[in-house]
């Protein structure tokens, strides 16, 4: 290992000379305390290093030792239910080692627990030919996650020895005879974070990732293996949307990256997730979650690493055949870290001071999402769905981070400050948001939920757009100038907004809505419209239609529990009978 010498320190950036044997992206130990850093630029024998820990106390002349390895993560049993910092140091072990509630400098802790024994059950046998990605056994990591142990990349040969029993992550579980000699396999493997894990082939995403949030699932769905952006100003509810998708999203593994956001928000996740039950398994949500906390007061450089660490862990579970979602909150803070490092490197700035390579770095991250066939004999299919929050200053979505993100992702959930001020949550603006997966997801919904799902969605969306146009007229000449048909449209659109799109994240029945319940709710609201139009044609006054008692039941249908969905069919029957009664009375009276 070559030792260099520091010649300059500028915040998280350290420049060292005598580093001619090092490579870009090598990990180095900086100073007497051995702070972890990564080389981001080489000029002759001078290396520019971004340090992932606080650099106070380091000065020129201090040593820099290269490890000769890129920044890598340890992948194996013990990831689920863990909380790491940006460079995969477990925070609980960190606290014990540092004996402090705050991050101390130069503390070395292993990413995965070396003492804990895991029960390994082999699925391969001696004599089997194996190559990269083949599953050789399993470990029941939590009640929900079966951890498949795969042959690491670069290993191909015949199994010479394989053992069942309890092992820690460093003990040998199998020996593979390769052309270059015997290779020992353990429960753990390492992977460089900046390099995407290989797969056999990419697939077209065709299935929606349901979230239980009506505005998302019905109007702007994201596919399993898709990418979505959630831009919005402060206080618009980005973090709650991310939490809701993490809690109720239809994925088997959740990787939640808190990147440069408030520490309290990560505390919320830690407090809430263990108590919440997964609707599919009945187990705690924490039993399928990996948390990476890189809060706003932690070193800036580690924000970049935290995003890559998160996506690498997500790809690892994808290779096992799982559907994984990764939440990054917020990519703007990561971009700000890039801007700070770029400024200290004295690079030519791009828009608003961000580096010229901002777009390509964002693309590197989002392009690692997708649905794939993993390497290995059994053709496992896995998916990584990436959902990134963006925090544009002042809610201005024309700024570089939002624009670069929108060029890459296919789903845009635009949060609106005006809706948030009106206490309309989730404050996703239905007129500016979009999903490019809509057509494919509509086909899936028509086949699996109800054959008129797409038709109902199109009708509801058209009503909301008509409402926006009619509101202009109402502002100018008042409601009285509208025809009864137009007034009915406004009332139904209001019902869609307040009774369907608005959702209470803290109400036990309203926080999550199944696709079946979503269909029945939307069908109820639009059935009211169709029945009301018949009544108006029969000569019934609109005021009478709007005063029907069944309207209250339609509005409160969102609070019906999933077990009592059949009550909605009763409301539909009641709606039709009340309307028919009005028509039989009103039609005669007004004839």
From Swiss-Prot:
Residues that hold ATP according to the record: 232-239
SUPFAM superfamilies documented for this protein: C-terminal domain of alpha and beta subunits of F1 ATP synthase (SSF47917), N-terminal domain of alpha and beta subunits of F1 ATP synthase (SSF50615), P-loop containing nucleoside triphosphate hydrolases (SSF52540)
GO CC list: proton-transporting ATP synthase complex
Ion transport among keywords: yes
Source species: Clostridium perfringens (strain SM101 / Type A)
CDD domains membership: ATP-synt_V_A-type_alpha_C (cd18111), ATP-synt_V_A-type_alpha_N (cd18119), V_A-ATPase_A (cd01134)
This protein's name: V-type ATP synthase alpha chain
PANTHER family: H(+)-TRANSPORTING TWO-SECTOR ATPASE, V-TYPE PROTON ATPASE CATALYTIC SUBUNIT A
EC number(s) per entry: 7.1.2.2
Annotated family: Belongs to the ATPase alpha/beta chains family.
UniProt xrefs under HAMAP family: ATP_synth_A_arch (MF_00309)
One matching Pfam family: ATP-synt_ab
InterPro entries: ATP-synt_VA_C, ATP-synth_a_Xtn, ATP_synth_asu-like_sf, ATPase_a/bsu_AS, ATPase_F1/V1/A1_a/bsu_N, ATPase_F1/V1/A1_a/bsu_N_sf, ATPase_F1/V1/A1_a/bsu_nucl-bd, ATPase_F1/V1_b/a_C
GO BP: any one term: proton motive force-driven plasma membrane ATP synthesis
């Amino acid at each position: 290992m070559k030792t260099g010498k520091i010649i300059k320190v500028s915040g998280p950036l350290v420049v060292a000379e005598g580093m001619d044997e090092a490579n870009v992206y090598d990990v180095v130990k900086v100073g007497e305390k051995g702070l972890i850093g990564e080389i981001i630029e080489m000029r002759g024998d001078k290396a520019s290093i971004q340090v992932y820990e606080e650099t106070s106390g380091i000065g020129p002349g201090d040593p820099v030792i290269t490890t000769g390895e890129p920044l890598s993560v340890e992948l194996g049993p013990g990831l689920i239910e863990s909380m790491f910092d940006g460079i995969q140091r477990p925070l609980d072990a960190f606290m014990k080692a540092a004996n402090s509630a705050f991050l101390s400098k130069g503390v070395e802790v292993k990413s995965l627990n070396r003492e804990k024994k895991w029960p390994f059950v082999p699925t391969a046998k001696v004599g089997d030919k194996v190559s990269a990605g083949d599953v050789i056994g399993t470990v029941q990591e939590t009640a929900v996650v079966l951890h498949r142990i795969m042959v690491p990349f670069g290993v191909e040969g015949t199994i010479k020895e394989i053992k069942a029993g309890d092992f820690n992550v460093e003990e040998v579980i199998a020996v593979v005879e390769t052309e270059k000699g015997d290779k020992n396999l353990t429960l753990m493997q390492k992977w460089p974070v900046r390099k995407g894990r290989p797969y056999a082939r990419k697939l077209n995403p065709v299935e929606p990732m349901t979230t239980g949030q009506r505005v998302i699932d019905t109007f702007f769905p994201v596919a399993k293996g898709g990418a979505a952006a959630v831009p919005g100003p402060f206080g618009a509810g980005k973090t709650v949307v991310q939490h809701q998708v993490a809690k109720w999203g239809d994925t088997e593994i959740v990787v939640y990256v808190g990147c440069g956001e408030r520490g309290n928000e990560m505390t919320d996740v830690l407090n809430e997730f263990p108590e919440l039950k997964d609707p599919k398994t009945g187990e705690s949500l924490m039993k399928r979650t990996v948390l990476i906390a890189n809060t706003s007061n932690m070193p800036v450089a580690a924000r970049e690493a935290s995003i890559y660490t998160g996506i690498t862990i997500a790809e690892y579970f994808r290779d096992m055949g799982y559907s994984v979602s990764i939440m990054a909150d917020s990519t703007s803070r990561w971009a700000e870290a890039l801007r700070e490092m770029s400024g200290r490197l004295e690079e030519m700035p791009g828009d608003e001071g961000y580096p010229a390579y901002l777009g390509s770095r964002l693309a590197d991250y989002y392009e690692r999402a997708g649905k794939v066939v993993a390497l290995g004999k059994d053709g496992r299919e896995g998916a990584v769905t990436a959902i990134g929050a963006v925090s544009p200053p002042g809610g201005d979505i024309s700024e570089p981070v939002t624009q670069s993100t929108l060029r890459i992702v296919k789903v845009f959930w635009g949060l609106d400050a005006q809706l948030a001020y009106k206490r309309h949550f989730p404050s996703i603006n239905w007129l500016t948001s979009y999903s490019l997966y809509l057509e494919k997801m509509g086909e899936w919904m028509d086949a699996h939920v109800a054959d008129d799902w797409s038709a109902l969605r199109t009708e509801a969306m058209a009503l909301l757009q008509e409402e926006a146009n009619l509101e202009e007229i109402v502002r100018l000449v008042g409601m009285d100038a509208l025809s009864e048909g137009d007034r009915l449209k406004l009332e139904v659109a209001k019902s869609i907004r307040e009774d369907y799109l608005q959702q209470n994240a803290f109400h036990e029945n309203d926080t999550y809505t199944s696709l079946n319940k979503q269909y029945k709710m939307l069908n109820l609201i639009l059935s009211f419209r169709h029945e009301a139009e018949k009544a108006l044609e029969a000569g019934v006054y609109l005021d009478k239609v709007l005063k029907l008692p069944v309207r209250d039941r339609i509005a409160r249908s969102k609070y019906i529990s999933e077990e009592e969905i059949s009550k909605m069919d009763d409301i539909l029957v009641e709606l039709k009978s009340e309307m028919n009664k009005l028509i039989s009375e009103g039609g005669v009276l007004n004839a």
